[in-house]
Design a protein with these regions (language model features):
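Acidic/polar hotspots within intrinsically disordered regions
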Residues: 2-5
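Short Gly/Ser/Thr- and charged-rich N-terminal loops/segments
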Residues: 12, 16
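Short, Lys/Arg-enriched N-terminal segments with co-localized hydrophobic residues
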Residues: 25-37
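Conserved alpha-helical substructure of the radical SAM core
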Residues: 34-156, 167, 171-172, 179, ...
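Short, electropositive alpha-helical surface patch
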Residues: 131-133, 208-217
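Conserved phosphate-donor/acceptor-positioning beta-strand/loop module used by diverse small-molecule
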Residues: 159-161
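Conserved strand-turn element in the central/C-terminal portion of the radical SAM core barrel
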Residues: 185-213
Length: 217
């Protein structure tokens, strides 16, 4: 199960229907405690905001981009941890990303999600890539384990915390980084208040047993 806890909008809304500049939307979501009503997700509203993609030529709206196949976690169920940067891992260069992003934008892509098998923040050019997306007014989001604190300005930033204490984190993630990730989340939340208030910061949990949800909270 994948449980996502959002402070403001969901990632899909950030990159699809709603703009972070919409003040009425922000007030509405704050009044709801930061959660969308369930029917909102099944009415087709997000798709209807892209009616040209339904009635016209079928084109992608968002693009997920893997910046690297290297990860600094060692999850026992994942293959990406076996790659090392100096022994077969690959990372997309800044120059190549720009080429691909411009081509995708020309096709009609409106938003980008920096994600992966690998951990996107490990890419040596990550901050340059993130800066370029922001400077060129692209809507973009990122999924990260947040072992590394980065001060960037996406529309949404989703952290895979996944555990509820040091022991459970190390069991799931293969590294002892639970407290470090928590501190990075706190530091980013404080930083974004002044520097990127429009960013929706969320946390997701990997649930093995229903009881884990109670422990997480």
């Amino acid at each position: 199960y994948d449980v996502h806890h959002a402070q403001e909008d969901t990632p899909q809304d950030k990159l699809g229907t709603h703009s972070p500049e919409n003040p009425e939307r922000k007030v509405e979501e704050r009044e709801k405690g930061g959660y969308l009503k369930m029917e909102k997700n099944i009415t087709g509203e997000k798709m209807l905001s892209h009616i040209d993609r339904i009635a016209g030529e079928k084109k992608p709206i968002t693009a997920d981009i893997f910046l690297t196949n290297y990860c600094n976690n060692r999850c026992p169920y994942c293959t990406y941890g076996r790659w090392e940067l100096d022994a077969g891992a690959q990372a997309m260069r800044y120059e190549d990303f720009i080429i691909y992003a411009k081509r995708l934008a020309a096709m009609g892509v409106q938003g980008f999600i920096l994600t992966g098998g690998g951990e996107p923040t490990i890419n040596p050019d990550f901050e340059k890539i993130a800066g370029w997306l922001t400077e060129n007014n692209f809507r973009w989001g990122m999924n990260t384990n947040f072992n590394k604190l980065v001060k960037v300005k996406p529309n949404y930033l989703k952290v895979s915390l996944d555990a509820y204490n040091n022991e459970s984190y190390e069991q799931l993630r293969g590294v002892a980084a639970y407290e470090k990730v928590r501190e990075n989340i706190k530091a980013y939340a404080a930083w974004k208040k002044e520097n990127s208030p429009g960013t929706s910061l969320g946390i997701q949990q990997l649930v093995k047993e229903p009881e884990d949800v109670k422990r997480f909270y």
